[in-house]
Amino acid sequence: MARLVALDKVRNIGIMAHIDAGKTTTTERILYYTGRLHRMGEVHEGGATMDWMEQEKERGITITSAATTCFWSPNYGNYSGLRHRINIIDTPGHVDFTVEVERSLRVLDGAVALFCAVGGVEPQSETVWRQANKYGVPRIAYVNKMDRTGANFFDTVKAIRERLSANPVPIQIPIGEGEIFAGFVDLIRMKGVIYDKDDGSTYNEVEIPHDLQNEARTWRINMLEAVSEVDETLLEKYLNGEDITEEEIRVVLRKATLNVSIIPVLCGSSFKNKGVQFMLDAVVEYLASPVDVGAVEGHHPRTEETVVREPRDEEPFAGLAFKIATDPFVGKLTFFRVYSGVLHAGSYVLNTVTGKKERIGRVLQMHSNKREDIECVYAGDIAAAVGLKDVRTGDTICDENNPVVLEKMIFPEPVIQIAIEPKTKADSDRLGMSLAKLAEEDPTFKVKTDDETGQTLIAGMGELHLEILVDRLKREFKVEATVGQPQVAYRETIRKAVEFEGKFVRQSGGKGQFGLVNLKVEPLEEGKGYEFVDAVKGGVIPREYIPAVNAGVQQAMKDGVVAGYAMQDIKVTLFDGKYHEVDSSEMAFKIAGSIGFKGAAKKADPVLLEPIMKVEVVTPDEYLGDVMGDLSSRRGHIEGMGQRAGAQFVNAKVPLSAMFGYSTDLRSMTQGRANYSMEFECYREVPRSIAESLQEKRVSKETV
């Protein structure tokens, strides 16, 4: 099957924003106008195509990143009339599902950042913006909900500049705001666009309304100055007072958008069907194709040499698995982005992370949760594979004769955990397998057994995250379970460097056990995790035993020395040791490594850490004092406050342990008129009094 759309006419985009900015509604309108839908679904009716999980329909929020493909030929611009393929990923706005945004942005070439014209830049807008900056994703901004009372396009543009440190450049300004929002002025063509009907497919081009002409001229000059700053030829023409053509503006705007020096800003009301087609034109005009993004770099799995893959069909196949999902009809689905080459259904691929070769059973083009079998998938495309059993999120799949490992994805560790118990024997039999499947899909969901109580603990990014997963256990896997109260996922670390000898000797007749290691443990910067350095010289420990020492240390780190919590941000150097020709074994050195680490950690000033959350509360004026007092009583540190969209906002850093049940308390404190958002910020040392009570709990557990 030949390629239907040239690679330079492919756009892989994400739709990203704060919760309730209108992402899913906007995607529904895109699918309607591009011919993928014949009837539009509404989020508030639970009928949105992209929200296909039961939990999403009930809550009216997007939890997983649904993927779909559509085609669009722009009405205006340098690409007018040329058919383009757009692969869209609709991402969640709730902070508990931040991993879905992270893994989507890793494989996208561009994004539409949605902002609510009333709320402006909200906390999750900042989070997804930082994630997009991390991957250098070009963006256009779409100010949605212009029909809402209190909508203010220019305030939103100002907030993008100030709160996101971005360079927003409006290429449209609205004609009317709130109930009288009627259309926009196109600053490139200097024409007005007035929508006739609510279906948005009919509009009239008009001269710019008289009362907007001065404002339109001012904003056009602003746009011309912005594009002139990034192109010397254009700057010369602008300074000489020469005319700058529409085509020249678009070419330079595209270049500046691709290097993220300019964010073009558009406006609309997706719910009222206004603005979506022009936003699609902008996606094609300004966002990157795989050709613009260029080659990806990886390394050879054995030699570690740099390997470059160009985005061409003729190159060897290389792709990145960015999402695992369980489909009730076809089983395990692996979503992947093709960076180079072509992949045919039925062919074999190598997973360079596990070293295993696997067969691709089927290749599917996904449309939300519907699927369409295709023969093959080309460079630059996004698709789903059936038949890959051992592939995890972030793994590279490639041509077995041309191996490459692409950059892995790094996910945050869970900050909250709950105990879960099956209700019946039948539930007990299914629980382990079901939890394993959920953990396979979601890298921020972890399952472990409490060594002391024998309970199964599940950990995630927030209360809603775990609530959704427990609900999925019941609906998808038919497992009934009771859950305990949420618990904070505390951590432990050390504050000073220490050297220690770990020795394991056992002589009981016959072959004994012997392993001796000298370890240096020292603290790492926050967030660095764990580092093991082999500094052994002169063969005092045979090479085959070194990995066993590392394994023993990592095993010991799971159960900290202060209160039994996992340890982090530690560097361990193995610098000396001894072995016995007959009695030494991998097991002996693993135990010696564990003993050595535990002994060193106890002397290295170990401390307990707790997750600190970044909290923003938006409240009416009259409750501001109560809200601030309450946050302070929760050991919160107020970092800033201000006014936005007619309400007060407070930013604070608060320990997670003090935030359980906060939504209920905030509702009663403000008569339901305030709301808040919360995301993980960092780990900090626990105050002495709390550390002592946690240690006492551990001691009482051990003596029971």
UniProtKB/Swiss-Prot annotation:
List of residues binding GTP: 17-24, 90-94, 144-147
Main location class: cytoplasm
PROSITE patterns tied to this protein: G_TR_1 (PS00301), G_TR_2 (PS51722)
Listed Pfam families: EFG_C, EFG_III, EFG_IV, GTP_EFTU, GTP_EFTU_D2
Key words of the record: Cytoplasm, Elongation factor, GTP-binding, Nucleotide-binding, Protein biosynthesis
Location within or outside the cell: Cytoplasm
Domain tr-type G: 8-291
Protein name as annotated: Elongation factor G
Native source species: Chlorobium phaeobacteroides (strain DSM 266 / SMG 266 / 2430)
